[in-house]
Amino acid sequence: MANVEIRVIGNDTYRVEGTVEESEKKLSDAARSGQSRLAWFKELASGEPVGINPAHVVSLRTV
């Protein structure tokens, strides 16, 4: 499976499981659901869930 790096405002990055397309869909779905809705991913480094606010995402890229 591909991995994606999500960069957010403040230059923090999260490496998560999935493809760019899957990540973009999760972020898009969360953005359409409301302002306080987070997109949930599994972080590669820790294996823990991480919630990301779609309004804070700067870029996505495959790693």
What are the language-model segments listed below?
Residues 1-63:
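Eukaryotic intrinsically disordered, low-complexity regulatory linkers and tails enriched in Ser/Thr/Pro
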